[in-house]
Design a protein with these regions (language model features):
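Secretory pathway export signals and precursors
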Residues: 178, 264-266
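Mature cores of small secreted peptide/protein domains
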Residues: 187, 273-275
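Active-site "substrate specificity/gating" loop of NAD(P)-dependent dehydrogenases
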Residues: 279
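Catalytic zinc-binding patch centered on the HExxH motif and its immediate surroundings
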Residues: 282-285
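Sequence contexts marking disulfide-bonded cysteines in secreted/extracellular proteins
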Residues: 267-271
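Extended, basic/helix-rich recognition subdomains
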Residues: 243, 257-262, 273
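Glycine-rich, compositionally biased intrinsically disordered regions
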Residues: 2-179, 183-196, 201-247, 251-255, ...
Length: 324
């Protein structure tokens, strides 16, 4: 018999197990199959649906009897992250706001100076995985507990964090790991939002804009300089195009703009980027005096919302809103 050594293969999103009679199934095979299926689901969510709150997850800070009771609440709900991870929050989650601010008082003072000062916080929902259902593993005697027992399941889970928004400077050295800074919207998200604004400035009818001009205008959606300057929200009168040019605009978006955006945010389903695993639920604005927070307001206007295909279909079949 020929001797061989079984080596662990690198997980590949494009491969699934091809079982043949007699094939020995080991850890590598099960991991590869799971990786393939999970990556396909996540890619489907990312590329065809997007990300955001699907339902629920409302953020509130109700009035409290004492400062210690002041809490941030997140209601049950469902969301999809920019990485395509699905997050289900089954029950209301709460966090003591003044306790969190007190634990991070030194770090906040490093960022903003001595209190009092205004603080803006992001409420972020993260996808997490937890190993669970520990079972005994057969093997040699005289092993430690770590070697005898192993988790047999991986449970989908989540984590809710408060992150600092609008810090005046980059985080200095020594900033605690527990204190997270909000990340600005990705270029892809900004371009997608601008894509919707762009079509609000388009009137389909008799035409008037050349194909080249329309192509160049749509291509600007991949230009961060144009987006920083407020384009296309600062467009003046409506652009006149023909019905045939609608397809040209969509084709330019799919064939040229999206590949440029893809190059800035590679489509990696299992990378280490935490921003791909989190979704914004809302922002809190407050005044911190070093002991208690006051004037707390909740702003959910920046929260991305993800409509179901059915809801979008019903909305569009009714003609959608009339823009003025």
């Amino acid at each position: 018999m020929t001797d061989f050594v079984r080596t662990a293969s690198r997980l590949d999103v494009g491969k699934r197990v091809n079982y043949s009679f007699g094939l020995v199934l080991g850890v590598d095979e099960f991991r590869q199959e799971q990786y393939h299926v999970l990556a396909k689901f996540q890619r489907h969510n990312r590329q065809l649906h997007g990300f955001g709150t699907v339902w629920g997850l409302k953020v509130s800070v109700p009035a409290a009897a004492t400062p210690a009771d002041l809490e941030v609440r997140v209601e049950p709900g469902f969301a999809i992250t920019p990485g395509g991870h699905e997050i289900c929050v089954p029950a209301r989650m709460c966090a003591k706001l003044n306790a969190w601010l007190g634990r991070n008082a030194d770090a906040l003072a490093t960022l903003f100076g001595a209190p009092p000062f205004p603080v803006s916080l992001c409420v972020l929902l993260y996808y997490r995985e937890n190993e669970t259902d520990t079972v005994p593993i057969p093997g040699e005697p005289c092993r430690s507990d770590d070697e005898v027992l192993a988790p047999s399941r991986i449970a989908d889970s989540f984590e809710i964090k408060l992150a600092v928004d609008g810090a005046p400077t980059s985080p200095p050295m020594g900033l605690p790991d527990a204190l997270v800074l909000c990340q600005p919207p990705s270029l892809t998200r900004r371009a997608e939002e601008a894509f919707g604004v762009f079509w609000q400035h388009v009137k389909v009818g008799g035409g008037g804009m050349s194909d080249q001009d329309l192509h160049d205008q749509v291509l600007r959606l991949a230009d961060p300089t144009s987006l920083d300057a407020g384009w296309p929200g600062n467009l003046g009168s409506a652009m006149q195009i023909t019905p045939a040019q609608v397809e040209l605009g969509l084709r330019t978006w799919a064939l040229e703009v999206l590949p440029l955006l893809q190059a800035t945010t590679p489509d990696c389903p299992c990378g280490p980027d935490e921003s791909a695993r989190s979704v914004l639920l809302g922002r809190l604005d407050l005044q911190w005096d070093g002991t208690v927070a006051s004037g707390v307001t909740v702003d959910e206007s920046g929260r991305p919302i993800l409509l179901s295909t059915r809801a979008a279909q019903e909305w569009l079949s009714g003609g959608g809103p009339t823009w003025t």
